[in-house]
A protein has these predicted regions:
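A short beta-loop-alpha structural element at the N-terminal edge
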Residues: 3-18
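A conserved beta-turn-beta hairpin within the catalytic core of GNAT-like acetyltransferases
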Residues: 66-83, 93, 115
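Conserved beta-strand-loop-alpha-helix junction that forms the acyl-donor binding cleft
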Residues: 118-128, 144-150, 157-158
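Conserved acetyl-CoA-binding loop of GNAT-fold acetyltransferases
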Residues: 132-142
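Active-site rim helix/loop that mediates acceptor-substrate recognition in acyltransferases
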Residues: 23-72
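Conserved GNAT acetyl-CoA-binding A-motif
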Residues: 109-121
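A short, internal acetyl-CoA/4′-phosphopantetheine-binding micro-motif in the GNAT/acyltransferase core
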Residues: 86-93, 121-122
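Conserved acetyl-CoA-binding loop-helix of GNAT-fold acetyltransferases
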Residues: 94-107, 132-133
Length: 199
């Protein structure tokens, strides 16, 4: 299937296909509602790749080198680069396309004096297993929690009666299983992974 696969740099004319690839690729994952309407623009050195097959974008990767003040990567052991997006269309998985994108990211990182690649993901086991198969190591985790309706309102302290929050997305170090489940709409464990490329 991938004999004609081309991995190349993203260009602005790819944006619509890039957005479609990301949307469809995330649809069967825990990030199904993390929808972009515009492709992000990066302020620091970055690698933006697309995997193209017969004119169709079937995979994408965005990697950004950490800023001088270290405000992008959570890890502080050297210079890092963050994978903001990596995705492959469901029908095109199991052909090693995502792994090829990561290999390109490693090559770019070595040339650009990056010591490690960092990535964050939710608790899809198949995604976690994939990162670990590439020698990424988990270094931290926390929780994404969603509240809706009256439960969202109870978290929002405002004297403005014209504001009525209907949904709240929160980061938490507290396991949501210890909270009142009737107040939570849904939650995910978000884990940080790190690939040391100095070895």
């Amino acid at each position: 299937m991938i004999e004609n696969l081309i991995i190349r740099e993203y260009n602005s004319s790819d944006e619509k296909k890039w957005l479609q690839c990301r949307l469809i690729s995330f649809h069967d994952s825990a990030y199904y509602d993390d929808v972009y309407t515009k492709k992000p623009v990066f302020n620091n050195s970055s690698l933006e790749l697309v995997a193209e097959l017969n004119g169709k974008i079937i995979g994408i990767l965005d990697l950004e080198k950490d800023s001088e003040d270290g405000s992008i990567c959570y890890c502080k052991s050297g210079v890092g680069a963050m994978i903001w997006t990596i995705a492959v269309l469901p029908d095109c998985r199991r052909y090693g396309i995502a792994s090829k994108l990561v290999l390109k990211a490693k090559e770019w990182s070595k040339v650009n004096d990056v010591n490690f690649i960092e990535a964050w993901t939710r608790d899809d086991k198949w995604v976690l297993d994939w990162y670990e198969s590439l020698d990424f190591e988990k270094f931290h985790s926390y929780w994404h929690i969603y509240f809706k309706g009256d439960n969202a309102k109870s978290l929002f302290d405002s004297n403005d009666k014209d504001i009525s929050p209907q949904s709240v997305f929160a980061h938490s170090n507290k396991n949501p299983k210890t909270l009142d489940q009737n107040k939570i709409d849904r939650f995910y464990k978000c884990s940080g992974y790190k690939l040391d490329i100095t070895k």
